[in-house]
Amino acid sequence: MLESVSVDLQGNNFTLLVIQTHTTCTSQIQLELTQKIKNSPSFFSNNTPVVINVENINHHDDWFNLYQTISNIGLFIIGVCCCYNKKLKNIITQSGLPILTKGNIIKSHKNTIKTNYTKPTFDDKTNAISKTQTIHTPIRSGQRIYARNRDLIIISNVSSGAEVIADGNIHIYGSVRGRVLAGASGCEQSQIFCTKLSPELISIGGYYWLNDQIPPEFLGKSARFYLQNHTLIIQHIS
């Protein structure tokens, strides 16, 4: 008689936002976080999971105040990263929160803009993406599309609150208001092409920008994203 299996252990990849503070002033942190949430209401919701980068936190009182401030906003703290203070690490560990390594979390870099369409060069080996998935219908709020081991072409709109993911490149011939994640399996040579840009999030190979990090002159326009030296680069498409 075969035994029934009640539990499976599965590996998976999840996108986590990291909050890094550059001040211990909780009122300022609360004000800026609240504004970011207001600017991207479909991306954030009650209990949105986040990781806190505590690299700039050295005193346990600052940690407790920061934890309380972020929790009161409605975000759900699932762990911390970049904890190099041994005393603080012990306090956080005893509270039950895991301390994550940088490899577990999604990364963010400053805006970089290039106006000329020059082909980028990369040091990493190219991941083999041999197929393409094409979608001709709108991607509605709440929908999630994942093109595993292939490129993704969407000939329609991506609504706010929707998420489109591909291990390869992503082409969107329509309005983009949701989340777009290319190179989901780690391929940093993946690119994103959009004809009408206004996304909640853009990510390639784990490096991402939120809407308010995208230079305003690109919003509503056609644009191309790619990575160069682990930095996101955006260009106009004429």
Curated annotation (Swiss-Prot):
The gene is minC. It comes from the Bacteria. Gene3D superfamilies: 2.160.20.70, 3.30.70.260. Disulfide bonds: none annotated. SUPFAM superfamilies: Cell-division inhibitor MinC, C-terminal domain. Keywords: Cell cycle, Cell division, Septation. Interacts with MinD and FtsZ. HAMAP family: MinC. This is Probable septum site-determining protein MinC. One of its GO terms (biological process) is cell morphogenesis. Cell division inhibitor that blocks the formation of polar Z ring septums. Rapidly oscillates between the poles of the cell to destabilize FtsZ filaments that have formed before they mature into polar Z rings. Prevents FtsZ polymerization. Belongs to the MinC family.
